[in-house]
Amino acid sequence: MREIATEGLRRIEASLNYLAPTDERPVSYAYPPPLGVPWSTAREEAHTAPIYDLRPIARNISLDEAGFQLVSHRSAVENFWDEEELKRVYYPESVELLKQVTGATRVHIFDHTLRRRVAGVQDRAAGREVPRQPATRVHVDQTATSGVTRLQHAFPGEADELLRHRVAIVNVWRPIKSPVLDAPLAVCDARSVASDDLVASDLLYRDRRGETYNVSYSPRHRWFYVPEMRADEVLLLKCFDSAFHDVCDRGHNALIVKRCGR
C-alpha cells in the first residue's frame, strides 16, 4: 500500500524522542522501581522531523491502511475526571463508536488513562497526586506478543476462542478540553515504518510483564497531527490486529509522541 502523500500539506518542525542505538533489551517500570533502579533503561535520542497537518486529508486515511483514523464524535460526558460518569457514559459511547467505525460485533473497554500536562513533571514519576503526563517518547503500546497476552489477561479462558476470529486493540484518543494548544498527539503512517525500526521492550507491572515497542529513528517516517484538535474530534490508533502477523509492515500500528510543539 502507498504511504500518505504529503505534498502541499501544511507542516511544522518538531523534535521527536526516539530510542538511541542499543544492544540491550530496554526495560521500563509502570510503578515505582526498586531503590536505585531507573524508571527506564531506554536512552532517548532526539531527531527533528516534519509533522504534517492531518485534517485536510483525514477522510482518505483509515485504520486498516495507516494504523490511525480521525473521526468526528461529540461526547455527552460533562466531567471526564468523574470516574463514575466516565464509565457510565463514555465507555458505552466508545463501544458504539468503535462498532460503527470498525464493524466490530463485540467491543470491550479494558482501561482508560487521563493525561494533563504539568510543566516540569515526568510521567509516572510524578506520583498519584499529579495527573499522568503526556508520553514524550516515540512508542507503540502493544507488540504482536503483548496483544495476545492482553487478550488472555482480559478474557481468561476465552482468549483462544476469540482468536479464532479477528481481534484488534484500538486506542480512542480525544481532547477533554479544546482546542489543544500544548502537547498535541502526533501519529506516524505505519507504512513508513520498517520492522527493523521496532525494538521490543519490557514493561514491568506489579503483577505481570508487558511488552511495548520502542522505535529507532528513520528519515522515512511520516508524521501527522491535528492542529488545535477539538473535543469533538477523536483519533483512533490501532495497536494490535490478530489478522496480521507483522502489524507494522502491514500498516496496523500507530507510533505516538505527545509533545509535538508548534
Where do the PLM segments sit?
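Non-heme Fe(II) oxygenase catalytic core, chiefly the N-lobe of the double-stranded beta-helix
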Residues: 2, 6-227
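Catalytic core of Fe(II)/2-oxoglutarate
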Residues: 213-262
